[in-house]
Amino acid sequence: MADMAPTLVTMEPCSGAHQIAEQIQELGHEVMMISGRHVQAWVKDHCNGQKTDLNDAFAILNLAYDRWLTPIRGKTREECRLLALQASYRQLKGQRTKTMVHVKATLHAWGFPIRAGSFNQKVLHELIDANREAFGDEVAETLHLMINRVRDLDHDIATVLKLLTEATQRDPRASLLRSIPGFGVLPTSRWCAVVGDIARFDSPKQTMAFIGLVPNNRITGHHTETSSGREARGQGKMSKRGDKMLRSLCILGAASLCLMVRNDRLPDCPFVASIKERLASSRPWFKVLVYVAAKLVRIATALLKYGETFSYEKAGISKAVLKQWELEQAKAA
């Protein structure tokens, strides 16, 4: 390929696809990655579902000319590093949770229930030593080993989180995202690794749709009103498309923000007032979280687009009112 003229290379994502795409781009070619879901659908419609290498290649060739198709964005080497650190963090957290559950379940089976949320390692070691005769030496030593494993996992998790923080800080977008209340290291690093250049989204709503925080539309043209008399425009539950981890982290960030608002730990502003209004309404808790998470995504999109840090005075104000406010501030100066 090094001797070929610059051309378009289409491919399905595979193991190491982003590194392969980066090497092809270094040779001067353009890379287009097409989701296997689209290839499978094309083969099913045009080749009677007969999956062969030739049919897959023919599908990729035809899908490359589909101007409505959204290809998979190739990730940079730095974004792949962030994804690797995040995967290691989740793996260690999962091991820690499973180990804690195993220790608690074993103690509970022997008649020593441990309350939820409690895992004092010193107390557990003393409990096992005090009842060594009941447990037996083999079970007691195994429980000590498992508790020490939780301690080692805590150290490893803290180390990986520190490395993830250092890697995230190298991204110029991190300082802008970290200024948003509710955006910590994990959602910021996931955003930097998954979303990519914010300029590829025409509006904040497209960013919300990319993450999966918009209603799922199912419009047929029938039944414009529900049984309660409210007009229904075909909007159902949350679409849940896109990256699941980023969506979950945005909702968790919204939960922490709602708790800060409920405890009056944030200054009074239109942004906080809108959240208080939602919390005071009769809407379910999770619907309020999705609303706040979507608002955080819109704010993050605006900050990255204009290169500004978060401001409580500007958040929650429409663009027209904000423009008028900026003009008044300029005249006063």
Task: Give a label for each model feature.
Residues T10-I20:
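Acidic, metal-coordinating catalytic cores used for nucleic-acid/nucleotide bond scission
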Residues R67-P71, T99-M100, I157-A158, G196-R200, ...:
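Short helix-capping/linker segments at secondary-structure and domain boundaries
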Residues Q25, M32-I72, V123-N131, T224-R241:
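Short alpha-helix plus adjacent loop in nuclease-associated cores
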Residues Q86-L176, I317-A320:
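Glycine-rich, often acidic, oxyanion-interacting loops/wings at catalytic, nucleic-acid
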Residues M1-L8:
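Short, basic/hydrophobic alpha-helical segments
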Residues R218, H222-H223, R230-E231, D264, ...:
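Low-complexity, acidic/Ser/Thr- and charged residue-rich accessory regions of DNA metabolism proteins
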Residues S175-S179, V185, W191-S281, W285:
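Phosphate-backbone recognition surface of nucleic-acid-processing proteins
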